[in-house]
Amino acid sequence: MAKIALILGSVRSPRVGNDVTGWVHDVLKSRPSDDLQIEPLVIADFNLPVYDEPVMPAMVPAMKQFTKEHSKRWSAAIASYQGYIFVIPEYNGGIAGGTKNAVDYLYNEWPGKPVAIISYGTQGGNRANAQLSESLELVMKMKVAPTKVLLPFAAGTDVFSAINDGVLGEESQKAWAEAGKKEDILKALDEVKELLKQPKE
């Protein structure tokens, strides 16, 4: 059985990412029975500082080793999965620093594995989605699912509750369902499944 990490990219507190990732997880649970095991993975739980290792990630493990416990834990966690689904916010028109820092902590744990990207924000996080897609595909040599899911918050009180209170509003959830976002998420997962069948390059 292949294990897929459902990675929550935000490290802020409060963060609406908890609710968004929960909503996405519920959608994924609605899929027909398959041989995938999907597990939530929260970047904030690893307490990663700005990269503080004395070695380049690309040198690990062939030539060097990580020296910090947080790096070792993060590396071991990511290495244990065969694929990933990122759920990421967009801050100030781009990828969140905590997300990028966590990705850049590692190198050899990523290449050849499939990944889907789901983003959220006032406009759905399209810029952050595109930036992470490019980084993972071109630099980390990952297989990025073609379907990029954008989850924009409903206008009005939902935006304020998301930003200020870390709460996902009912109107946003309703709008996502009506816009076919659940189907998009399941389509992205199907693409990850197909990419899993391809040999690593």
Curated annotation (Swiss-Prot):
One of its GO terms (biological process) is terpenoid biosynthetic process. Keywords: Flavoprotein, FMN, NAD, NADP, Oxidoreductase. FMN binds at residues 12, 90-93, 120. It is an enzyme of class 1 (oxidoreductase). One of its GO terms (cellular component) is cytosol. Its EC number is 1.5.1.39. SUPFAM superfamilies: Flavoproteins (SSF52218). InterPro entries: Flavoprotein-like_sf, FMN_Rdtase-like_dom, NAD(P)H-dep_reductase. One of its GO terms (molecular function) is FMN reductase [NAD(P)H] activity. Pathway: Secondary metabolite biosynthesis; terpenoid biosynthesis. It catalyses: FMNH2 + NADP(+) = FMN + NADPH + 2 H(+); FMNH2 + NAD(+) = FMN + NADH + 2 H(+). Homodimer. NAD(P)H-dependent FMN reductase; part of the gene cluster that mediates the biosynthesis of the meroterpenoids nectripenoids A and B, as well as cochliquninone D and isocochliquninone E. The pathway probably begins with the HR-PKS ntnH that catalyzes two chain-extension steps to form a reduced triketide, which then primes the SAT domain in the NR-PKS ntnG to initiate three more cycles of extension to give a linear hexaketide corresponding to the polyketide part of nectripenoids. This is NAD(P)H-dependent FMN reductase ntnL.
